[in-house]
Amino acid sequence: METDPILKVEREPEFTPSPAPEAIVKDIEQGVAPVSQNEPDRPQHWITRVVIIVLIVLAWYFFSLLLSMMNKWIFSESKMDFQFPLFLSSCQMLVQMGFAKLTILAFPRYQPNKKDNFSWLEYFYRAGICALVTGLDIGLSNASLETITLSFYTMCRSSILIFVFFFSVIFRIEMFDWILLCITLVISAGVVLMVATETQFVLSGFLLVMASSVLSGLRWALTQKLLLDHPWTSNPFTSLFALTPLMFLFLLVAGLIFEGPVRFIESPAWKEFGPFMSVVILVPGTLAFFMVASEFGLIQKTSIVTLSVCGILKEIITIIASTLFYHDILLPINIVGLVITLCGIGVYNYYRITKGNKKEAEKEVEYIVLNENA
């Protein structure tokens, strides 16, 4: 079984034909054309595999798009206007922790070996730093949706790749590469075109989403350094179970400081939406977990090239959906900037996969694709 480097998942092995039976060998030696007993099954096997992959991709798109749309609806000033993204994000961490634990219990192959457990000191050092940065990344990105459009948010989050490249060089995970620098500059130009002509530009929202993108790049570097080589966090479910308790604590403390417990308790949303608030608290965390699970399945079943292409299509679908449902306005220059950025991302991924350290490239590309809408 081949092991995926970022999530250490076992990919399905490629088809390898079994040795020919003696009867078939004799037929070949005698000039008789053998009839393959497996031949009728091959098209059916191929079709089944394609159907499974398509269903996984659709599930990934569904959960990702629904999560983005729901977060925008919850936090937008013109919609629900629930002004507590940090508190709500902390609740989502508890939901994801519960689902992660249930998955580990239900599927023993995801259970880590007890001898590989973190010591408490190691846990707070390794997981604590990653959880703090990840929690801030998610909290700030959710907070930005209060004031900026979903399409603008998605375009800004596409800049994650720039910061992944920057921090990979700073932390000496990757050697400096002039070609990659040129590609990231092209992507930066595309982001500038998207941002400079935004018709509903709000500086505070822009700063929040860009800060979350910077933290996402830092999060990638810290994850490479502190977590991925540890056997206890060898798959996304044990990683979630390790990180979410600390992420909950960090986000809760941040919510108490910046949003205030009294304002949270006395929010008019509790009276206005009543029992629906339980949906607001539980559903986003559930969607986030199943998005991670579908990503995991996609990584198992496909190549990194397929994942990269699907990730770019996901960005386009999210932006189209935001223009249809939330009536976001895109000017021609926005679209030009978006095309430049997405093409730059495609070229970057292709270069990283075909040149240099292939294992590190696959880890980086997977992270970028799966976290643009985190």
From Swiss-Prot:
Report one GO cellular component.
Answer: Golgi apparatus
Origin, by domain of life? Eukaryota
KW Cell membrane (keyword) present: no
Query: Where would one find the signal peptide in this protein?
Result: none
The name on file for this protein is Uncharacterized transporter C22E12.01
Gene Ontology MF terms in the entry = antiporter activity; triose-phosphate transmembrane transporter activity
List locations, semicolon-separated: Membrane
User: Is Transmembrane helix a UniProt keyword of this protein?
Assistant: yes
Q: Which family does it belong to?
A: Belongs to the TPT transporter family. SLC35C subfamily.
* PANTHER family associated with the record: SOLUTE CARRIER FAMILY 35 (PTHR11132)
GO biological process terms on file: triose phosphate transmembrane transport; UDP-glucose transmembrane transport
Main location group = membrane
Protein species of origin:
Schizosaccharomyces pombe (strain 972 / ATCC 24843)
Q: Name one Pfam family in it.
A: TPT
Query: What are the record keywords, sorted?
Result: Membrane, Sugar transport, Transmembrane, Transmembrane helix, Transport
Membrane-crossing ranges are 50-70, 151-171, 175-195, 201-221, 238-258, 273-293, 329-349
